[in-house]
Swiss-Prot record:
<feature type="binding site">
    <location>
        <position position="58"/>
    </location>
    <ligand>
        <name>Mg(2+) 2</name>
    </ligand>
</feature>
<dbReference type="GO" id="GO:0006979">
    <property type="term" value="P:response to oxidative stress"/>
</dbReference>
<comment type="similarity">
    <text>Belongs to the tRNA(His) guanylyltransferase family.</text>
</comment>
<comment type="subunit">
    <text>Homotetramer. Interacts with MFN1 and MFN2; functions as a guanyl-nucleotide exchange factor/GEF for MFN2 and also probably MFN1.</text>
</comment>
<dbReference type="Pfam" id="PF14413">
    <property type="entry name" value="Thg1C"/>
</dbReference>
<dbReference type="InterPro" id="IPR038469">
    <property type="entry name" value="tRNAHis_GuaTrfase_Thg1_sf"/>
</dbReference>
<dbReference type="GO" id="GO:0006400">
    <property type="term" value="P:tRNA modification"/>
</dbReference>
<feature type="binding site">
    <location>
        <position position="105"/>
    </location>
    <ligand>
        <name>Mg(2+) 2</name>
    </ligand>
</feature>
<dbReference type="GO" id="GO:0005525">
    <property type="term" value="F:GTP binding"/>
</dbReference>
<feature type="binding site">
    <location>
        <position position="58"/>
    </location>
    <ligand>
        <name>Mg(2+) 1</name>
    </ligand>
</feature>
<comment type="function">
    <text>Adds a GMP to the 5'-end of tRNA(His) after transcription and RNase P cleavage. This step is essential for proper recognition of the tRNA and for the fidelity of protein synthesis. Also functions as a guanyl-nucleotide exchange factor/GEF for the MFN1 and MFN2 mitofusins thereby regulating mitochondrial fusion. By regulating both mitochondrial dynamics and bioenergetic function, it contributes to cell survival following oxidative stress.</text>
</comment>
<feature type="binding site">
    <location>
        <position position="105"/>
    </location>
    <ligand>
        <name>Mg(2+) 1</name>
    </ligand>
</feature>
<dbReference type="GO" id="GO:0005739">
    <property type="term" value="C:mitochondrion"/>
</dbReference>
<feature type="binding site">
    <location>
        <begin position="58"/>
        <end position="63"/>
    </location>
    <ligand>
        <name>GTP</name>
    </ligand>
</feature>
<keyword id="KW-0548">Nucleotidyltransferase</keyword>
<dbReference type="InterPro" id="IPR024956">
    <property type="entry name" value="tRNAHis_GuaTrfase_cat"/>
</dbReference>
<keyword id="KW-0460">Magnesium</keyword>
Length: 298
């Protein structure tokens, strides 16, 4: 009887094995169907190896978005902090990003030089960053604009740039920070003329046409008693996001001797977190202070 039972089990297993092989063969045949040739039309967008991959996103038609949502001019700290929160979320989700820089309605994300994330496909870098950022913007909106409902979903476009050396990467980030300074100085003077002097936007634009940075600083100081150098660093320098070790102090119950049972103690632990900085990244000082960003092992 035992032998007969074993024979039945063996026959059952053999039949199952045959069925499984047929299913696998059928699956392979279906996967390699006659329609598979359409994959040949996909463009190869692999980023060059051993280069810094940068994804820069910009708000789409954000002038209109800012007007519709009553952004404060020339700078709305709520909007800037929201942008930074979204960028931090992106970095926490995509840990191959070593540094990010943001100003106004744009953010640039720099991936590790040796990152092999999604086989270095540019489309993957761009779509993951932009989609994560856009969804975070909507998700965290109410945390920063409590009294202003989101009237319609914001849009962001993105691009991928590849830089072959540390110097070209530093020059790129310097360019973006220089752009922040130029735009913010202009906007600070422009809105002072509109809001405090009563000029129309067109009149303010004509007043500033052809002026240099020194001229704009003079207008601010002589007419509005504003020293541009005293404006918040976040407005003048933008925001740099880097990974840093941070000590966190939390209070929790710890198992202690009986006489101290039920006591709570402060526990300090070190975590690596995304930290915002408002500093100058043009020149060598920043990079000497944070050499790990350009480490060859990145």
């Amino acid at each position: 009887m035992w032998a007969a039972g074993a024979l039945k089990v063996r026959d059952c297993l053999a039949a199952t094995s045959v069925t499984l092989r047929r299913c696998l063969k059928l699956g392979a045949t279906m996967a390699k169907s006659k329609f598979e040739y359409v994959r040949d039309f996909e463009a190869d967008d692999t980023c060059l190896p051993h280069c810094w991959v940068v994804v820069r996103l910009d708000g789409r038609n954000f002038h209109r978005f800012a007007e519709k949502h009553s952004f404060i001019k020339p700078n709305d700290s709520r909007a800037l902090h929201l942008m930074t929160k979204c960028a931090q979320t992106v970095m926490n989700e995509l840990e191959d990003i070593v540094i990010a820089y943001g100003q106004s309605d744009e953010y640039s994300f720099v991936f590790k030089r040796k990152s092999n994330w999604f086989k270095r496909r540019a489309s993957k870098f761009m779509t993951h960053v932009v989609s994560q950022f856009a969804s975070s913007y909507v998700f965290y909106w109410r945390d920063y604009f409590e009294d202003q409902p989101l009237l319609y979903p914001p849009g962001f476009d993105g691009r991928v740039i590849v830089y072959p050396s540390n110097q070209t990467l530093k020059d790129y980030l310097s360019w973006r920070q220089a752009d922040c300074h130029i735009n913010n100085l202009y906007n600070t003077v422009f809105w002072a003329l509109v809001q405090q002097s009563g000029l129309t936007p067109l009149q303010a634009q004509e007043r500033l046409q052809g002026t240099l940075a020194a001229d704009k600083n003079e207008i601010l100081f002589s007419e509005f008693n504003i020293n541009y150098n005293n404006e918040p660093l976040m407005y003048r320098k933008g925001t740099v996001l880097i990974w840093q070790k941070v000590e966190e102090i939390t209070t929790k119950e710890v198992k202690l001797p009986a006489e101290m049972e039920g006591k709570k103690m402060a526990v300090t632990r070190t975590r690596t977190m995304v930290v915002p900085l408002h500093c100058n990244i043009i020149g060598d000082a920043f990079w000497k202070e944070h050499p790990e960003i350009l480490d060859e092992d990145s």
